[in-house]
Amino acid sequence: MLKPLGDRVLVEIIEEAEQKTAGGLYVPDSAKEKSQRGKVVAVGTGKTLDNGTKVAMEVKEGDTVYFAKYGGTEVSLEGKNYSLLSERDLLAIVE
């Protein structure tokens, strides 16, 4: 598994169910919108400010989050898709 550095978060992308058009045609993966929801599987230690103070992360492992559509770096590990994001690219935590 990857250990994010600083204020980065590793999010396992939650794949959406197979999509079908009103006419009954299946939408291929290449035509689907990129998923914007995932489960946090690892977090960094937090952001370090210029004065050396460490800012704690707001998210924790296990949180379900929404993130910026084109934010982060996509990573595939052990057959699963992940996104490595800065905490600022996270939009919301699902409660």
Swiss-Prot record:
It comes from the Bacteria. GO terms for molecular function: ATP binding; metal ion binding; protein folding chaperone; protein-folding chaperone binding; unfolded protein binding. SMART domains: Cpn10. The keyword S-adenosyl-L-methionine does not apply. CDD domains: cpn10. Signal peptide: none annotated. It is found in: Cytoplasm. GO terms for cellular component: cytoplasm. Keywords: Chaperone, Cytoplasm. It holds the Pfam family Cpn10. The keyword Plastid does not apply. GO terms for biological process: chaperone cofactor-dependent protein refolding. InterPro entries: Chaperonin_GroES, Chaperonin_GroES_sf, GroES-like_sf. Together with the chaperonin GroEL, plays an essential role in assisting protein folding. The GroEL-GroES system forms a nano-cage that allows encapsulation of the non-native substrate proteins and provides a physical environment optimized to promote and accelerate protein folding. GroES binds to the apical surface of the GroEL ring, thereby capping the opening of the GroEL channel. PANTHER family: 10 KDA HEAT SHOCK PROTEIN, CO-CHAPERONIN GROES. Belongs to the GroES chaperonin family. NCBIfam families: PRK00364.2-2, PRK00364.2-4, PRK00364.2-5. Heptamer of 7 subunits arranged in a ring. Interacts with the chaperonin GroEL. This is Co-chaperonin GroES. It comes from Deinococcus radiodurans (strain ATCC 13939 / DSM 20539 / JCM 16871 / CCUG 27074 / LMG 4051 / NBRC 15346 / NCIMB 9279 / VKM B-1422 / R1). The lineage of its organism: Bacteria, Thermotogati, Deinococcota, Deinococci, Deinococcales. The gene is groES.
